[in-house]
C-alpha cells in the first residue's frame, strides 16, 4: 500500500534528482508528511543518508515503467510464448500433412491397421477354433474361386467367418457364386470382407436407401436364417422370383411401417454410436488405407453401417431378432424355415455377413448360380439342383451352423436337398426315385419354397448362361458334367431311390450331421447310414438308417447339383458345394450305405463321421463329403483314393462304400461305391484304396467317395477292413476334402472313378476345385481321383494345371487362414490360390496328405491336373499335387516312403487311380514342405513347392520322381519348407524327375523315413505296425516336423507332381499340433502302414528303412534330449525347434545327409541361415536347387543380405554367408553321426544362429528382417529359428504371410524391424538370446523347459553376449551331443509328446513370439 509519505518521498527524491534545492527545502518544510526530514534537512535542502525511492525505484523510473506498460496495453504485440506455440503447432500440422501425403506413412498406417485387424481376426480365429475348419473350408472355396481376386475375398471372408463355422459355409456359397464374377467379388468382397459378416451385410444395406438399409439388415438376418440365397438377399433379383417377392414384401413392410424403421434405427443406433466410430476408422483404413480422409467421409456418408464392428452388427441383429415387432418380417423370410432360421440367425448372421461381403457380386453370383442351375438343368435334364443345392446347402449349412432344431433343420435341409434331389432326380432319375424324390421334393417345396423358386429361377436362362460360362471354362461339356453328375447321381440316386423313402427326413439331417459333428459319431454309426446321422445327430436327430438313406439321397441330389455346380462353377460352386455338397456326398454315401446295409454302408457314415470328426469343425469334413459327389467325377474319389491309398487299403471297403453311392446295384460289394458318398473312409483308408477293385467299381460308378477324407479311426475300425485306418483319433482328424466339379469325367472314366474312390483324406478340409475348362474338368477329375487330396486343396484354386502349380500355390492365407492352419489341418491356410491357376484344365487339388500318398491327415495335398493331360482325356490328367501338411509333420515324412514305394504298389496307394495314374503322371506333383514360408513362384501364398514326380497322382504311380527336396527339411525343419518353395519345379519337372530320381530319392528316402517317423510319431498309437517302427522315428520327426516336411515326401512319384505341403503354424499350432500331429500321424500312420511296404524297397535302398526305423527309434530316444535342447534353446519356439531337430535327426541320418548335401545344401544353408526369411529360404530351398535356382539365388541373396545385415557369423554353422552354413551343414552331414548333429546343427543354426546372431551382432534389427515372416510375426528370432517352416506354416498359414510372395519373405521381417525399431528388435533379440541360452542350458542339463525357463529368468540378467556365445557353442555341442544322445537315448515318443505339450505351455500355440517373450516377464 502506497502511503502519502511514500509519495512525498518519491516527489522529494525527484526534486533532489533535478537539483531543485530551494523547492526541496520548501517542500520538506511545508509537507506534513516529511516532518522527520525537515528536522534533518540541510541548508542545501538535501536529506543526507536518506532513500528517497520506492522499492529502489525513483519517481521517474516508476513513471517510465508505467508509461511503457500503458503503451504495451494499447499495442497488439503477440507474446513470444504464443508465437513459439503457434510455430510448433504449425510445424506439427505440416508434419501431419506431409505424413498423410507420404506413401510410407500411409503404408505404415495401413500395415498397422491391417496388422491390428489381422491380429484381431486371428484372435477371433483362435477363439473360434471350434469352427475353424469350416472357416478353412470357406477360405478354400474362396480360393477355389476361379479368379485370383476371389481368393482375396475368400481370405478376408474367411477371417470374419473364422469365428463362425456356419457363416463360413454360407460365405463359401456366396463366394462360389460370386467367383464367376471374380471382379465384383473382389471389389465388394475385399472391402466388405474386412468387415465381419454382419458388417458385410450392412455393406449391402448401406448401398441401399436408408429405409431399405434398415430393412436389409433385418432381411439379412432373416435371410441368413433362410437359405443362402435368402442371405444373399441384397441381390433379390438373383434369387427366385418368390424370394424376390419375399424380400420386396419385407421391404414394403419395413418401409410402410415407420415403427419398424424407428425400432431398427433405434437398435442400430444403440450399438452404432459406440461401435461405428471405432470400427469404421480401422475398416476404412483397411479398405482405403491410402486415402483415409476421403474413405472415412465416403464410408461414413454412404455405408457407415458397413464399418460397424461385427459385434455391433451382431448385437443389432440380435436386438432386431429378439424384437417381436419384427417377427412378421422374419416370418416372411422363413418360408417354413422359421425354426431353422431362428436357430441360425445368430449363427447365420455371421455367415450372412460373410455373404454380404460378396453381396454385390452375389447378384451376379446368384445369376451365376441360376446359370449353373440352368446349365445343370440342361446338362442334367434341366434340373436346377445346382442353385437349389446352393441354397439348400446354405440352409443346410445354416442348419448345421445353428446346430439346433436338428430335426427341423434336417427337414428344411432335406427339403432343400430334396428339391435339388427332386430336380436332379426328376431330370436325371425321375423314374428312379419318384417316391423319394417326392418326399424330399415335397419337403423342399413346403419348407424351401424360396429354394424352389430359386431353383426355378436357376433353370432360367440366366442361370444357364452363368452355368454355361462356368461349365465351359470348368467342364468340357456341361452335358458331360451333367452326365457325370447323372452317373454318379444316378448311382447315388438309384441307391437313394431305393433308400430315399427311408431317408426323406434325413437327407438334410445327414448333411447337417456331416457338417455338424459327424466325425466320431458317424464312426459309431458307421454300421448304418444312421451312423452318418449319428454324427450329424447333433445337427439333426439321428435318423434311422432309412433316414440316413434319405439324407443321403437328398445329399446325393445336392451332390448332383454340386457336381454339376462343381463342373460349372467348380471353384465357387465347388467351394460352396464342397461345403454343402461335402455333406451331400456324405449323405449320399450313407444312402448308398443304406442301400448296402453292409460294411460299406456303415463305412460311409464313418467316413462322414470322420470327415465331420476331422472337421468338426467339420465343415471341412463336410466338404470332404462334398467331394464325394465330385468323386463321382472320379476326381474326388481319385483324390480320396490318392490321399488314402494306404488308408484305402486299410479301409478299402469303407472307401468303396463311401465311394459308390453311384450304382445302387453295387451294394455291399459295391458297398464301397455307396461308401463313396462320405467315403466313410474319411480316414485315408476310407477311400477304399485297399479295396482297389471295389474302389475301381466305385470309380466307374463315378464314386462320390470323393470325400470322406479323414474317416476317424473309429470309422476305419468300424470298417472291419480298415485296420489300417489306424486308430486315427477322430477328434484329432481334420479332413479336408476337395470336390472337383468334373463329374462327367468321373462318370465317364471308370479309371478316374476308381482313382476318386481311392482318394480319402483323413484330415482334409473339403475344398472344391472346379475345372477351369471342360478339358480340365476331365483332367481335373482325374487329378482329384488321383489326389482327392486335391479336396484338400483347401484354399488352392485350381487353375492352369501347368501354371497352376505356381498359380495354384498362390495360396493367399490370411489371418483366418492362419487360424485355419491352426485348425489342425494344414488346410487351415486355406491358401487362396489365385484362381489364376485355371489354365486350361489345370486344377490344384489339395489332397489330404493323410491320404495314401501323403501320410499325414493334417497335411493337405494339392494336386493340379494339367490341361494338356486333360486333353488326353478324363483319365489323362496331369496333376499337380500340393501337399499341405496341416500341422502334422508326419505327413511329409511318411508319404515319401509310401510314394517311393507307391510306384510298385501304385494300386495299393492309388488303387483306383492307378489306371488313372498314367494320366496323373502327366501332371506334376509339387510337394511343399513348409506351407508358410515356401512359396510357389506363381503363388501368392508361401507354399513350399517341390516337384514330387511326373506322376500327377500323388497316390498313384511311382513316387520315383517325387521331388522331396522340401523333404530335406526333415533335416532342417525350416529348410524343408523352403526347399519345396520352387514353383519352378514345374519347368524343371523333367530335370527334377531326373534329379529326384537320384537326389530326390535320397531326399525322399530321408523325408520318407522322416515322414514315416513323423506320421508314426503322431499316429504311433493308432498305427502300430509301421507306426511303431516309423512311429518311433517319426515320433521324433513328426513332432519336430510338426507336419511341415511330412507332406512333401508324401508324394514321391516320378511324374512331375507338385505337392504343396502346407505346414500349419507351429507356434500357433503348438497346442493344436498335438492334435494335428496326432491326426496327421494317424493318417500318416495309415499311409505308412500302407506305404511302409511300398516305400520300404526304395527307402531301404536309399535310406535302409530298417536302419531308418532304428534311427527313428534312436532319434526318438534322442528326441527328448533334442527337445530339451530345443526347449532350452528357445522355450518359445522349442516346439518348432524340437520339431526341427527331431526332423533333422529323425530322418535317416544318411538320408538327411544326402538330402541336405544333394538337395539341401543350399536349402540347409538357407534353412539354417535364412530360416528366418522363410519365404526367401523357401523359394531357394527345394525347388531352388533344381528349378528354383533363380529362387535359390534370390533366397541366397536375401540370406546373404540377411547375414550381412545380421553381420552375425556368430555361429559358425550360421556362417554369415549361406555358404558357411552350408559348409557346416555339409560337414556335419557328411558323417552319419554328423548327420544327426548336422540336423541338429541345422536346427541350432536356424534356431540358435538367428537368435545368437542377433545377440552376438547386436544387430537384431537386421536379423529381424533376415528372420523374415517368422520374425515379423514372432519378432523373436528364436521363434523363427525354432521352426521357420513350421512356424511359417502356423503363422503364415494362418496369416497373410503365406500370401506374401516368396521374395517378400524378407518383407515381413523388415516391417517388424521398421515398425518396432532397432531398439525393440535388439530387445527382442536379447529376449530370444535369453530363451535360446536357457534352451541351450536345458539341452545341456536335459532339464524340463519350465525349469529352464525359470533358470533363464533368474539368469536372464547375466550378460547376454556371454550367453549368446556360450549358447552358440552349446548349441553346436548340444546338437552334436544331442545327435549322439538321440541315437543313444531311448526317450519314448510319449516323452516327446509331453515335452511338446510343455513347449506349448511355454510358448502357446496362438501366441506370437513377442507375446510369448512378454509373457516371460524378463527383467532385463
Curated annotation (Swiss-Prot):
Q: Name one GO molecular function term.
A: transcription corepressor activity
Start and end residues of each stretch annotated as Mediates transcriptional activation: 263-339
The UniProt record lists the Glycyl lysine isopeptide (Lys-Gly) (interchain with G-Cter in SUMO2) crosslink at 1112, 1144, 1274
Q: Which Pfam families match?
A: NPAT_C
Q: Which UniProt keywords apply?
A: Acetylation, Activator, Cell cycle, Isopeptide bond, Nucleus, Phosphoprotein, Transcription, Transcription regulation, Ubl conjugation
Q: Subunit composition?
A: Interacts with the cylin/CDK complexes CCNE1/CDK2 and CCNA1/CDK2. Interacts with BZW1, CASP8AP2, CREBBP, MIZF and YY1. Interacts with the RUVBL1, RUVBL2 and TRRAP subunits of the NuA4 complex. May also interact with GAPDH, NME1, NME2 and STIP1.
Q: Cite the record's Basic residues compositional bias ranges.
A: 1389-1399
The chain residues annotated with the modification N6-acetyllysine are: 1223
State where composition is biased (Low complexity): 697-712
Q: Give the protein family.
A: Belongs to the NPAT family.
State the encoding gene.
Npat
Q: Which domain of life is it from?
A: Eukaryota
What is stated about domains?
Answer: The LisH domain is required for the activation of histone gene transcription.
Q: What is the name of this protein?
A: Protein NPAT
- Chain segments carrying region Disordered: 179-236, 534-612, 625-670, 696-727, 1089-1190, 1202-1234, 1249-1297, 1348-1400
Keyword flag Acetylation: yes
Provide the LisH domain boundaries. 3-35
Q: Where is the composition biased (Basic and acidic residues)?
A: 1135-1146, 1154-1177, 1270-1279
Q: Bias regions of kind Polar residues — which residues? A: 179-190, 220-235, 534-573, 632-658, 713-727, 1205-1219, 1376-1387
Main localization, broad class:
nucleus
Q: Which spans of this chain does the record mark as coiled coil?
A: none
Amino acid at each position: 500500500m502506497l502511503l502519502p509519505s511514500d509519495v512525498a518521498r518519491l516527489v522529494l527524491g525527484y526534486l533532489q534528482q533535478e537539483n531543485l534545492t530551494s523547492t526541496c527545502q520548501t517542500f520538506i518544510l511545508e509537507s506534513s508528511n516529511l516532518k522527520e526530514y525537515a528536522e534533518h534537512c540541510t541548508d542545501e535542502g538535501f536529506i543526507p543518508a536518506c532513500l528517497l525511492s520506492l522499492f529502489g525505484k525513483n519517481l521517474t523510473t516508476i513513471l517510465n515503467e508505467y508509461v511503457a506498460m500503458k503503451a504495451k496495453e494499447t499495442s497488439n504485440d503477440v507474446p513470444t510464448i504464443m508465437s513459439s506455440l503457434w510455430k510448433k503447432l504449425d510445424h506439427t500440422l505440416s508434419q501431419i500433412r506431409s505424413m498423410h501425403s507420404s506413401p510410407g506413412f500411409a503404408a505404415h498406417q495401413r500395415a498397422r491397421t491391417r496388422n491390428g485387424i489381422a491380429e484381431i481376426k486371428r484372435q477371433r480365429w483362435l477363439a473360434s477354433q471350434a469352427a475353424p475348419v469350416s472357416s478353412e473350408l470357406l477360405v478354400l472355396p474362396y480360393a477355389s474361386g476361379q479368379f485370383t481376386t476371389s481368393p482375396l475375398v475368400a481370405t478376408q471372408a474367411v477371417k470374419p467367418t473364422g469365428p463362425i463355422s456356419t457363416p463360413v459355409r454360407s460365405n463359401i456359397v456366396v463366394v462360389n457364386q460370386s467367383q464367376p464374377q471374380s471382379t465384383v467379388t473382389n471389389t465388394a468382397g475385399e472391402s466388405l470382407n474386412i468387415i465381419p459378416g454382419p458388417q458385410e451385410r450392412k455393406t449391402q444395406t448401406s448401398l441401399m436407401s436408408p429405409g431399405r438399409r434398415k430393412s436389409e439388415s433385418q432381411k439379412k438376418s432373416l435371410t441368413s436364417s433362410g437359405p443362402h440365397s435368402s442371405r444373399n438377399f441384397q441381390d433379390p433379383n438373383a434369387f427366385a422370383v418368390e424370394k424376390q417377392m419375399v424380400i420386396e414384401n419385407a421391404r414394403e413392410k419395413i418401409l410402410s411401417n415407420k415403427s419398424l424403421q424407428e425400432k431398427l434405427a433405434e437398435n442400430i443406433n444403440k450399438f452404432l454410436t459406440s461401435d461405428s466410430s471405432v470400427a469404421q476408422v480401422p475398416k476404412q483404413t483397411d479398405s482405403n488405407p491410402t486415402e483415409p480422409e476421403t474413405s472415412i467421409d465416403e464410408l461414413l456418408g454412404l455405408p457407415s453401417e458397413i464399418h460397424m464392428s461385427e459385434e455391433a452388427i451382431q448385437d443389432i441383429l440380435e436386438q432386431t431378432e429378439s424384437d417381436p415387432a419384427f417377427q412378421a418380417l422374419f416370418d416372411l423370410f422363413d418360408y417354413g424355415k422359421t425354426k431353422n432360421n431362428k436357430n441360425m440367425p445368430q449363427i447365420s448372421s455371421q455367415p450372412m455377413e460373410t455373404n454380404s461381403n460378396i453381396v454385390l457380386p452375389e447378384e451376379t453370383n446368384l445369376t451365376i448360380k441360376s446359370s449353373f442351375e440352368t446349365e445343370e438343368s440342361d446338362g442334367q435334364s434341366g434340373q436346377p439342383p445346382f442353385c437349389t443345392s446352393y441354397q439348400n446347402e446354405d440352409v443346410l449349412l445354416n442348419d448345421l451352423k445353428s446346430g439346433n432344431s436338428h430335426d427341423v433343420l434336417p427337414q428344411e435341409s432335406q427339403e432343400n436337398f430334396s428339391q435339388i434331389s427332386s430336380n436332379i432326380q426328376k431330370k436325371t432319375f425321375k423314374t428312379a426315385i419318384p417316391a423319394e424324390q417326392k418326399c424330399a421334393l415335397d419337403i423342399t417345396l413346403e419348407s424351401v419354397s424360396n429354394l424352389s423358386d430359386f431353383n426355378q429361377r436357376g433353370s432360367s436362362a440366366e442361370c444357364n448362361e452363368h452355368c454355361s460360362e462356368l461349365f465351359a471354362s470348368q467342364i468340357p461339356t456341361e452335358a458331360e458334367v451333367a452326365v457325370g453328375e447323372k452317373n454318379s447321381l444316378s448311382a447315388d440316386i438309384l441307391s437313394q431311390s431305393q433308400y430315399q423313402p427311408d431317408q426323406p427326413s434325413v437327407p438334410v439331417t445327414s448333411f447337417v450331421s456331416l457338417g455338424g459333428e459327424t466325425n466320431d459319431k458317424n464312426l459309431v454309426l458307421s454300421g448304418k447310414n444312421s451312423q452318418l446321422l449319428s454324427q450329424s445327430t447333433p445337427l439333426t436327430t439321428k435318423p434311422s438308417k432309412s433316414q440316413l438313406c434319405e439324407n443321403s439321397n437328398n445329399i446325393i441330389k445336392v451332390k448332383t447339383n454340386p457336381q454339376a455346380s462343381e463342373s460349372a462353377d467348380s471353384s465357387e460352386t465347388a467351394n460352396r458345394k464342397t461345403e454343402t455338397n461335402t455333406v451331400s456326398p456324405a449323405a449320399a454315401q450313407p444312402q448308398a450305405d443304406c442301400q448296402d446295409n453292409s460294411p460299406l454302408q456303415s463305412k460311409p457314415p464313418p467316413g462322414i463321421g470322420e470327415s465331420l470328426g476331422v472337421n468338426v469343425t467339420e465343415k471341412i469334413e463336410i466338404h470332404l463329403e462334398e467331394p464325394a459327389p465330385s468323386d463321382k467325377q472320379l476326381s474326388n474319389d481319385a483324390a480320396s483314393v490318392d490321399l488314402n491309398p494306404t488308408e484305402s487299403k486299410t479301409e478299402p471297403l469303407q472307401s468303396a462304400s463311401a465311394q459308390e453311392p453311384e450304382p445302387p446295384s453295387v451294394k455291399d460289394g459295391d458297398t464301397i461305391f455307396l461308401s463313396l458318398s462320405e467315403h466313410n473312409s474319411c480316414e485315408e483308408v476310407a477311400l477304399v484304396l485297399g479295396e482297389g477293385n471295389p474302389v475301381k467299381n466305385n470309380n466307374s460308378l463315378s464314386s462320390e467317395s470323393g470325400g470322406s477324407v479323414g474317416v476317424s479311426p473309429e470309422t476305419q475300425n468300424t470298417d472291419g477292413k480298415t485296420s489300417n485306418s489306424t486308430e486315427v483319433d477322430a477328434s484329432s482328424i481334420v479332413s479336408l476334402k476337395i470336390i472337383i466339379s468334373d463329374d462327367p469325367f468321373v462318370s465317364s472314366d471308370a479309371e478316374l472313378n476308381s482313382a476318386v474312390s481311392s482318394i480319402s483324406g483323413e484330415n482334409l478340409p473339403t475344398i472344391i476345385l472346379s475345372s477351369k475348362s471342360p478339358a480340365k474338368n476331365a483332367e481335373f477329375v482325374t487329378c482329384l481321383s488321383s489326389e482327392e487330396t486335391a479336396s484338400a486343396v483347401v484354399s488352392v484354386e485350381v487353375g492352369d494345371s501347368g501354371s497352376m502349380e505356381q498359380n495354384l500355390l498362390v495360396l493367399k492365407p490370411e489371418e483366418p487362414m492362419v487360424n485355419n492352419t491352426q485348425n489342425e489341418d494344414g488346410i487351415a491356410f486355406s491358401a487362396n490360390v489365385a484362381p489364376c491357376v485355371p489354365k486350361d484344365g489345370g486344377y490344384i487339388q489339395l489332397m489330404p496328405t493323410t491320404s495314401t500318398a501323403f501320410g499325414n491327415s493334417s497335411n493337405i495335398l494339392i494336386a493340379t491336373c494339367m490341361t494338356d493331360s486333360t486333353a488326353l482325356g478324363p483319365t489323362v490328367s496331369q496333376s499337380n499335387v500340393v501337399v499341405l501338411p496341416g500341422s502334422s509333420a508326419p505327413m511329409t515324412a511318411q508319404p515319401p516312403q509310401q510314394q517311393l514305394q507307391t510306384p510298385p504298389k501304385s494300386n495299393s496307394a492309388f488303387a483306383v487311380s492307378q489306371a488313372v495314374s498314367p494320366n496323373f503322371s502327366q501332371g506334376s506333383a509339387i510337394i511343399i514342405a513348409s506351407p508358410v514360408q515356401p512359396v510357389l513362384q506363381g503363388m501368392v501364398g508361401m507354399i513350399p513347392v517341390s516337384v514330387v514326380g511326373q506322376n500327377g497322382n500323388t497316390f498313384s504311380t511311382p513316387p520315383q520322381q517325387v521331388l522331396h527336396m522340401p523333404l530335406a527339411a526333415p533335416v532342417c525343419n525350416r529348410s524343408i519348407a523352403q526347399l519345396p518353395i520352387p514353383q519352378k519345379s514345374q519347368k524343371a519337372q523333367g530335370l527334377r524327375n531326373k534329379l529326384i530320381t537320384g537326389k530326390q530319392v535320397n531326399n525322399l528316402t530321408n523325408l520318407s523315413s522322416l515322414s514315416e517317423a513323423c506320421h508314426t510319431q503322431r499316429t504311433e498309437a493308432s498305427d502300430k505296425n509301421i507306426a511303431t517302427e516309423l512311429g518311433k522315428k517319426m515320433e521324433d520327426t513328426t513332432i519336430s516336423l510338426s507336419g511341415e516336411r511330412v507332406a512333401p515326401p508324401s508324394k514321391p512319384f516320378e511324374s512331375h507332381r507338385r505337392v504343396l505341403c502346407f505346414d500349419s503354424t507351429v507356434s500357433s499350432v503348438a497346442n493344436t499340433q498335438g492334435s494335428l500331429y496326432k491326426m496327421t500321424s494317424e493318417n500318416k500312420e495309415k499311409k505308412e502302414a500302407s506305404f511302409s511296404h511300398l516305400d520300404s524297397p526304395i527307402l531301404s535302398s536309399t535310406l535302409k528303412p530298417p536302419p531308418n526305423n532304428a534311427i527313428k527309434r534312436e532319434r526318438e530316444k534322442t528326441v527328448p534330449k533334442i527337445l530339451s535342447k530345443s526347449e532350452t534353446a528357445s522355450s518359445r519356439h522349442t516346439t518348432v525347434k524340437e520339431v526341427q531337430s527331431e526332423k533333422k535327426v529323425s530322418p535317416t541320418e544318411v538320408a538327411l545327409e544326402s538330402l541336405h548335401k544333394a538337395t539341401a545344401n543350399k536349402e540347409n544353408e538357407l534353412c539354417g541361415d535364412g530360416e528366418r526369411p522363410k519365404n526367401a529360404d523357401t523359394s531357394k530351398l527345394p525347388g531352388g536347387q533344381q528349378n528354383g535356382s533363380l529362387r535359390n539365388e534370390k533366397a541366397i541373396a536375401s540370406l546373404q543380405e540377411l547375414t550381412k545385415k545380421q553381420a552375425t557369423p556368430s555361429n559358425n554353422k550360421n556362417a554369415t554367408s549361406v555358404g558357411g552354413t552350408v559348409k557346416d551343414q555339409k560337414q556335419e552331414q557328411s558323417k552319419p553321426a554328423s548327420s544327426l548333429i548336422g540336423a541338429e546343427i541345422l536346427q541350432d543354426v536356424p534356431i540358435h544362429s538367428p537368435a545368437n546372431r542377433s545377440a552376438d551382432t547386436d544387430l537384431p534389427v537386421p536379423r529381424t528382417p533376415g528372420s523374415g515372416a517368422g520374425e515379423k510375426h514372432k519378432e523373436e528370432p528364436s521363434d523363427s529359428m525354432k521352426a521357420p517352416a513350421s512356424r511359417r506354416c502356423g503363422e503364415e498359414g494362418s496369416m497373410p504371410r503365406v500370401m506374401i510372395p516368396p521374395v517378400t519373405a524378407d518383407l515381413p521381417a523388415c516391417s517388424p524391424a521398421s515398425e518396432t525399431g532397432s531398439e525393440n528388435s535388439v530387445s527382442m533379440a536379447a529376449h530370444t538370446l535369453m530363451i535360446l541360452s536357457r534352451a541351450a542350458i536345458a539341452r545341456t542339463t536335459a532339464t524340463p523347459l519350465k525349469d529352464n525357463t525359470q533358470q533363464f529368468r533368474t539368469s536372464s540378467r547375466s550378460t547376454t553376449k556371454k550367453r549368446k556365445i556360450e549358447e552358440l557353442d552349446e548349441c553346436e555341442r548340444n546338437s552334436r551331443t544331442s545327435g549322439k544322445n538321440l541315437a543313444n537315448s531311448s526317450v519314448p515318443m510319449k516323452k516327446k509328446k509331453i515335452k511338446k505339450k510343455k513347449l506349448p505351455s511355454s510358448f502357446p500355440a496362438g501366441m506370437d513370439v513377442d507375446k510369448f517373450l512378454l509373457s516371460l516377464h524378463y527383467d532385463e
